[in-house]
Amino acid sequence: MSKIKIKLKSFDADLIEEVSKKFVAFAKSKDIKMSGPIPLPTKIERITILRSVHVNKDSREQFESRTHKRLIIFENLDKKMLDALKRQEISTGVQVEIKEIN
């Protein structure tokens, strides 16, 4: 019996919500005490590129990528439930990081 911290990362907000709902549904079906999904701050990375390298210096283009994060904490999770949790089908495009907290 231990606490498990699951951190989800994705560039797509809808995809990360779908995966976090799957984890919540899993916890409710197995009667596991949990907290979350807790939305963590979204990291926004902006890149500015010159459109033309010579005369038109004022002409620039901006791109951004947003990394959405969620945190889910499961309490009193035994080894059998942890294995079942790891076997959950997760959409591609979502990074899942599982850590055990003592």
Curated annotation (Swiss-Prot):
Belongs to the universal ribosomal protein uS10 family. Involved in the binding of tRNA to the ribosomes. The keyword Ribosomal protein applies. GO terms for molecular function: structural constituent of ribosome; tRNA binding. GO terms for cellular component: ribonucleoprotein complex; ribosome. It comes from the Bacteria. Part of the 30S ribosomal subunit. This is Small ribosomal subunit protein uS10. The gene is rpsJ. One of its GO terms (biological process) is translation.
